[in-house]
Protein backbone atom coordinates (compact mmCIF):
# COMPACT_ATOMS: atom_id res chain seq x y z
CA UNK A 1 0.00 0.00 0.00
CA UNK A 2 1.22 3.50 -0.77
CA UNK A 3 2.25 5.77 2.05
CA UNK A 4 0.28 9.00 2.32
CA UNK A 5 1.99 12.26 1.54
CA UNK A 6 1.31 14.93 4.19
CA UNK A 7 -1.15 17.58 3.09
CA UNK A 8 -2.78 15.53 0.32
CA UNK A 9 -6.13 14.95 1.99
CA UNK A 10 -5.77 11.40 3.26
CA UNK A 11 -7.92 12.07 6.33
CA UNK A 12 -11.21 10.38 7.12
CA UNK A 13 -13.55 13.13 8.35
CA UNK A 14 -17.14 12.55 9.46
CA UNK A 15 -18.40 13.93 6.14
CA UNK A 16 -16.86 10.85 4.45
CA UNK A 17 -18.90 8.41 6.56
CA UNK A 18 -22.40 7.06 6.19
CA UNK A 19 -24.00 7.62 9.56
CA UNK A 20 -27.80 7.67 9.41
CA UNK A 21 -30.19 4.86 8.52
CA UNK A 22 -31.46 6.99 5.62
CA UNK A 23 -27.96 7.13 4.11
CA UNK A 24 -27.52 3.36 4.45
CA UNK A 25 -30.99 2.73 3.00
CA UNK A 26 -30.08 4.89 -0.02
CA UNK A 27 -27.19 2.53 -0.82
CA UNK A 28 -29.11 -0.69 -0.09
CA UNK A 29 -32.06 0.29 -2.34
CA UNK A 30 -30.24 0.28 -5.68
CA UNK A 31 -26.66 -0.85 -5.22
CA UNK A 32 -23.90 -2.21 -7.39
CA UNK A 33 -22.56 -5.29 -5.60
CA UNK A 34 -19.23 -7.08 -5.35
CA UNK A 35 -18.78 -10.20 -3.21
CA UNK A 36 -16.27 -12.85 -2.32
CA UNK A 37 -15.87 -15.41 0.46
CA UNK A 38 -15.08 -12.78 3.07
CA UNK A 39 -16.77 -9.50 2.13
CA UNK A 40 -19.76 -8.04 0.35
CA UNK A 41 -19.38 -4.45 -0.76
CA UNK A 42 -22.33 -2.39 -1.99
CA UNK A 43 -21.92 0.89 -3.85
CA UNK A 44 -24.13 3.61 -5.27
CA UNK A 45 -23.18 6.94 -6.85
CA UNK A 46 -23.85 9.99 -4.68
CA UNK A 47 -24.28 13.68 -5.50
CA UNK A 48 -21.41 14.85 -3.30
CA UNK A 49 -17.85 15.73 -4.26
CA UNK A 50 -16.32 12.79 -2.38
CA UNK A 51 -16.87 9.09 -1.60
CA UNK A 52 -18.43 7.95 1.68
CA UNK A 53 -18.04 4.70 3.62
CA UNK A 54 -20.48 2.78 5.78
CA UNK A 55 -19.72 -0.37 7.77
CA UNK A 56 -22.36 -3.01 8.49
CA UNK A 57 -20.68 -5.75 10.53
CA UNK A 58 -23.20 -7.76 12.50
CA UNK A 59 -22.53 -9.53 15.74
CA UNK A 60 -24.40 -12.49 14.28
CA UNK A 61 -21.78 -12.89 11.51
CA UNK A 62 -18.65 -11.74 13.40
CA UNK A 63 -19.11 -12.86 17.00
CA UNK A 64 -16.03 -11.43 18.70
CA UNK A 65 -15.67 -7.68 19.12
CA UNK A 66 -11.92 -7.92 18.54
CA UNK A 67 -12.57 -9.47 15.11
CA UNK A 68 -15.21 -6.87 14.19
CA UNK A 69 -12.87 -4.07 15.23
CA UNK A 70 -9.94 -5.49 13.25
CA UNK A 71 -12.05 -5.73 10.11
CA UNK A 72 -13.40 -2.21 10.60
CA UNK A 73 -9.87 -0.83 11.02
CA UNK A 74 -8.70 -2.55 7.84
CA UNK A 75 -11.67 -1.33 5.81
CA UNK A 76 -11.34 2.26 7.05
CA UNK A 77 -7.60 2.31 6.35
CA UNK A 78 -8.01 0.88 2.85
CA UNK A 79 -10.78 3.40 2.11
CA UNK A 80 -8.77 6.29 3.55
CA UNK A 81 -5.76 5.56 1.35
CA UNK A 82 -7.82 4.96 -1.81
CA UNK A 83 -10.49 7.65 -1.46
CA UNK A 84 -8.98 9.87 -4.17
CA UNK A 85 -9.54 7.08 -6.74
CA UNK A 86 -12.98 5.99 -5.50
CA UNK A 87 -15.08 8.63 -7.23
CA UNK A 88 -18.27 10.12 -5.85
CA UNK A 89 -19.75 6.85 -4.64
CA UNK A 90 -21.21 5.68 -1.33
CA UNK A 91 -19.87 2.28 -0.21
CA UNK A 92 -21.23 -0.12 2.42
CA UNK A 93 -18.97 -3.00 3.48
CA UNK A 94 -20.40 -6.14 5.09
CA UNK A 95 -18.23 -8.99 6.38
CA UNK A 96 -18.95 -12.70 6.41
CA UNK A 97 -17.94 -15.16 9.13
CA UNK A 98 -14.87 -16.53 7.24
CA UNK A 99 -13.33 -13.03 7.33
CA UNK A 100 -12.31 -13.68 10.94
CA UNK A 101 -10.00 -16.54 9.99
CA UNK A 102 -8.12 -14.88 7.13
CA UNK A 103 -5.09 -12.66 7.63
CA UNK A 104 -5.15 -8.90 7.15
CA UNK A 105 -3.13 -8.89 3.92
CA UNK A 106 -5.72 -11.10 2.22
CA UNK A 107 -8.57 -8.85 3.34
CA UNK A 108 -6.72 -5.75 2.11
CA UNK A 109 -6.18 -7.36 -1.31
CA UNK A 110 -9.86 -8.31 -1.44
CA UNK A 111 -10.86 -4.74 -0.62
CA UNK A 112 -8.60 -3.37 -3.36
CA UNK A 113 -10.33 -5.70 -5.83
CA UNK A 114 -13.80 -4.61 -4.64
CA UNK A 115 -12.93 -0.89 -4.84
CA UNK A 116 -11.70 -1.33 -8.42
CA UNK A 117 -14.68 -3.41 -9.57
CA UNK A 118 -17.30 -1.14 -8.00
CA UNK A 119 -15.69 2.09 -9.14
CA UNK A 120 -15.89 0.80 -12.72
CA UNK A 121 -19.40 -0.62 -12.40
CA UNK A 122 -21.01 2.32 -10.64
CA UNK A 123 -19.41 5.09 -12.64
CA UNK A 124 -20.80 3.47 -15.78
CA UNK A 125 -24.14 2.49 -14.24
CA UNK A 126 -26.07 5.29 -15.97
CA UNK A 127 -25.75 3.46 -19.30
CA UNK A 128 -27.09 -0.11 -19.81
Swiss-Prot record:
This is Ribonuclease P protein component. GO terms for biological process: tRNA 5'-leader removal. NCBIfam families: rnpA. Signal peptide: none annotated. It catalyses: Endonucleolytic cleavage of RNA, removing 5'-extranucleotides from tRNA precursor. Consists of a catalytic RNA component (M1 or rnpB) and a protein subunit. The lineage of its organism: Bacteria, Pseudomonadati, Pseudomonadota, Gammaproteobacteria, Methylococcales. Belongs to the RnpA family. It holds the Pfam family Ribonuclease_P. The keyword Cell division does not apply. Disulfide bonds: none annotated. RNaseP catalyzes the removal of the 5'-leader sequence from pre-tRNA to produce the mature 5'-terminus. It can also cleave other RNA substrates such as 4.5S RNA. The protein component plays an auxiliary but essential role in vivo by binding to the 5'-leader sequence and broadening the substrate specificity of the ribozyme. The gene is rnpA. It comes from the Bacteria.
Amino acid sequence: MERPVPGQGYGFPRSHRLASPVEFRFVFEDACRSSDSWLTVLARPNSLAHPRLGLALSRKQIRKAVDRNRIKRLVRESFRLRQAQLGTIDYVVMARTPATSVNSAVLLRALEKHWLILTRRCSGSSSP
